[in-house]
């Protein structure tokens, strides 16, 4: 019994020691956090460039559901013209592919948010460690990194929303054309 108690106390002491060392106010921890922050910022810049490219494509894309009324789209399907139907089916497929890709990007940027939250929490813990060691300058610097990572979290969330909103525009395009097809041809089509 006494041996078990000694082992339990030793385990608790090791756990406490590990936790303290995990967030020490030292050069190694700072370098780790700075590397992680630089990586997160670079990935954000890459996602932003990708979004801007996609936005340019989106702005130049012709959305049939915006160019033509629902009745006009129905009339294209009713004409039973193979050329029109091929073009409409191609538009549906293109819109669905764009929807899936943009939704994937929204999901990937959401995953990045989780990683940046961990980074912010690391800076917060390091700041507290610096404060407890009376290293006021390091504490203030770490706090500025906490604020910066919080801004990065907001930027990622905004970017994720933008990807998601573009994805929904493409989904609406696909669904509008499919709805017109269903109305014209009476098919029981999947609108998802």
Regions found by a protein language model. Name each.
Residues 21-79, 186-191:
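Immediate post-signal-peptide N-terminus of mature secreted/exported proteins
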Residues 26, 30-33, 44-48, 115-192:
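C-terminal amphipathic alpha-helix
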Residues 41, 45-48, 99, 106, ...:
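A structural signal for well-ordered alpha-helices, especially hydrophobic packing surfaces
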Residues 6-15:
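Bacterial N-terminal signal peptides
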Residues 1-5:
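Positively charged n-region of N-terminal signal peptides that target proteins for export
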Residues 6, 21, 28, 42, ...:
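Generic preference for well-ordered secondary structure
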Residues 17-19:
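N-terminal signal peptide c-region/cleavage motif recognized by signal peptidases
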Residues 62-108:
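Mid-chain, structured segments of secreted extracytoplasmic proteins
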